[in-house]
A protein has these predicted regions:
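Acidic, mature catalytic/reactive cores of soluble proteins
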Residues: 1-175
């Protein structure tokens, strides 16, 4: 791809979500390796932090005041940054806005018990960087079976996105 003819750049909901999913996939591998070699707990912590920071960036208005999540519509959109014109959300409901649903995984309680250094860093990050875990799935409230959910979207966002995804006038085919 080349530069935009008018300059500027696009913040991509789908591309950013794929990177969040990549971090979760790498986290899963690092946790598996850490079960055999505790040195990988540091690597796992780094991938978890990267995932959390990506999720934060997608859900919150940064220094430039831009968020990929549109609170009014209840959907993720790409955002076009145009010189001298500011930021323009590209309000087209497409698969681009559903890809954030792909970046999801769980942490099992048994795993956290086996990897105390990872759990300590996870708990420290949640306690000392609370803004980063805001507006994504709740990491500090254990769910069914004491699992912890890692997801870009929290329950409210999930329900709002599913309204579009399961609507025959939007995404769901009648066939």
């Amino acid at each position: 791809s080349g530069p935009l003819p008018t300059g500027g750049h696009i913040e991509q909901s789908d591309g950013t979500s794929w990177m969040a999913m990549y971090c979760l996939n790498m986290l899963a591998m690092a946790l598996e390796l850490a079960s055999e070699d505790s040195a990988y707990e540091d690597v796992a912590s780094k991938f978890w932090e990267h995932f959390t920071q990506i999720a934060y960036a997608m859900n919150n208005r940064g220094d430039d005041g831009v968020s990929l999540w549109n609170e009014e519509d209840g959907f993720f959109y790409d955002v076009l940054h145009v010189p001298n014109q500011g930021e323009i959300p590209m309000k087209t409901r497409s698969m681009v806005g559903l890809i954030p649903l792909y970046a999801v995984d769980t942490l099992e309680p048994e795993l956290l018990k086996r990897l105390p250094n990872f759990k300590r860093r996870l708990d420290w990050f949640i306690a000392n960087r609370p803004g980063y875990t805001r507006n994504q799935a709740c990491m500090f409230t254990p769910g069914m079976g004491e699992r912890r959910l890692m997801s870009i979207v929290d329950g409210d966002k999930l329900r709002r996105m599913l309204r579009y995804m399961l609507d025959e006038n939007e995404f769901l085919s009648p066939f």
